[in-house]
């Protein structure tokens, strides 16, 4: 019957013949499937081990490797299921033979075996990777032991605190020689002030004593935002705010008496309860200041305390490694003469020296170095010089000296340093990623040696003044480093031919017409000269060997001369934070250029020359020219591009950008503004996995999504390992940010004006994606700002440790009933906490201790302008300001201070607001009886909106 059926049904014959080929080879295919699955699993496990090992040294898995592992995890259960069913299917096949009575399910099974085997084989062929990782950004903070005070230092802290709290003391001066611990004491005082809820605490590193720099730091703390205001205007605005506040101003490192009135700081008095504390190396700075009420001197440690500190730094294991080492160690410690800085530096340098020969050699080097400084009384520079001489790696020495180009005790971006070193050719690695790894490792080494100090939430480093003094002494023959507001014109150098590197920072120079004959100059750092407007072409005429040119933060600089095209060896050009309007056409001649930074150049209109810079590896346009399809085509010509920062406006551009894998995978910073997100308002970040900073403004995003598949295996590195900063402003439909669970290194999160935001991390979504995971978010978060989120109910569903949190702001979140804090949160940290009084009243605290800890600092002590700082200077036509908030001013007729918004259009975006009318240089606050919108629309009137 079966034979008759097959003969009499010719239309089915091809079907049966086609299917039987699966049956004939079923057993062979099953054996092959079993073998290739074993091979595939072995390859997958090897990759996981390699990834895990590389993760330990700070590297990150390549996206293509993650996707391959994810596909293996998808196909593995299908193959295993087929193999589990193989016995019953083979038995069924044996029972029926290869006849037409075989069930259709067996045919389907045989077909699945073959197609699955082919899929597994394809995966196996694609599973060979020469590299499985690329560089992840370094840890936010290099773990260093906390500073422990000696007995005398602890007593000194108590003394300083008692004097500061004396009602008759308004200003306290702390003085002592460099390296003795003045900054440490000032930091300890700051921490005690924060714990004791004194009020507004402002910490300023004075640097070059530039009045406007001090004003800017104070203004930043007060929420004031300036661009081109005069020094006098800034002083008036600072004074208007501070005279209504109880504040403590901490000034670290002044060298002469400061004019408080010029800065805008009111004098402390018994009536206002304000305090000022400053540190200085000069007793005269204390004695000459008519406003100093008390002084505290810091002296060097006693011999026994110095020995205790030295032992602690060197470590017991080293001291016990040979019986003669403790005696030799006392000789080394004695050369430091009780100076904590020197003890820490030389102690760290000797912590790995475990032979008598090494210790004796160090004593010899110290003696030799002392002979180089016969006029030095304290012996500090000889110690520092001996540490430098003891560096075994010449590359580390060069990198260390490079750091001296920047002002003392001021932040230097780690990323900036690494980029300088790469472009200078200091780093030995030819591959850029390997060079970046080497650069960050060198920074880590210098921090561990205590020659650099971490700052800026771990993203920056700075150099102690005495360490920098030694570095400049070593490099003095080839370095020129100047700065400060006393400098009004370019300096004269006896022999420009000797100069290799020059730094001119924070001066009053306005125009440059000089033509220095400096053909050997390779590095010119000309930053933060706030009044610089014009540079002549002759200035660059003789700089034929220039490799690095940094003109960043010269905010008045509007153009570059065409003569810059003669810098044919230039590899690094930084024009960020300038008001430059266009790039010289001659820039296209700079064929050696590999790094071009145009971040925050909001006046820049076009960048057509980019298409000619074919060797570019780094291109930065964050908060600059918006990407369009023409610019995208130009960027695609840059085949060597490794890093890209962009501003994107428009859905078509965004879609096209994310579809080009080479460009998308190189994006480090993305500013997405006023863009309609297609696909139902869902923004997928899968393609931009190297993202470091994401800034979203005014987009219709409903949800931000990522590919969660790569997180099922615990061994896989989180997908967004690099992202450090996230800013979201005015995204009307966004409800949560659960994807941040995959951003373990997130350092700063700011979310404002998102009316539909209900949760920061959604418990339901997290459980659905990750299951009952024990991973806790925000382990590296230093700054959290939540403002204007009327529906926000939850940040996270359980208390979190927040181990490095430093700054917390929660305002205008009326539905927020619980905060993810308990008495163990932020333990060991001093957190500047600004929580609106209304929020404090409605929050259900874990316990009274938690409430006291996080609720002591409210809006009466703080002024915060909520205008997006990235919009500063933009015209109302291009970006109407949605809200500007002034906290702490209520009631009819009060005078308030705020940012100058002359000529800017302000529109209402909320429902409960107070209107502030501009009147000369003050603002009158009142509650209107008529609808706010009617008043906002009044022609010729400027308003501030103040939420109450």
Curated annotation (Swiss-Prot):
Coiled-coil zones: 20-57
Protein name: Probable disease resistance protein At5g47260
SUPFAM superfamilies membership: L domain-like (SSF52058), P-loop containing nucleoside triphosphate hydrolases (SSF52540)
Species whose genome carries this gene: Arabidopsis thaliana
LRR repeat feature ranges: 498-519, 520-542, 545-567, 569-591, 592-614, 615-636, 640-661, 666-686, 690-711
Keyword ATP-binding: yes
Domain of life: Eukaryota
Amino-acid positions noted as binding ATP in the UniProt annotation, renumbered to this chain: 176-183
Record GO terms (molecular function): ADP binding; ATP binding; ATP hydrolysis activity; GTP binding
Functional note: Potential disease resistance protein.
Pfam family, one: AIG1
GO biological process: defense response to other organism
Residue ranges annotated for the NB-ARC domain, each copy included: 134-432
Free-text comment on this protein's domains from its UniProt entry: The LRR repeats probably act as specificity determinant of pathogen recognition.
Gene3D superfamilies, A to Z: Helical domain of apoptotic protease-activating factors, P-loop containing nucleotide triphosphate hydrolases, Ribonuclease Inhibitor, Winged helix-like DNA-binding domain superfamily/Winged helix DNA-binding domain
The entry's keywords: ATP-binding, Coiled coil, Leucine-rich repeat, Nucleotide-binding, Plant defense, Repeat
Family to which this protein belongs: Belongs to the disease resistance NB-LRR family.
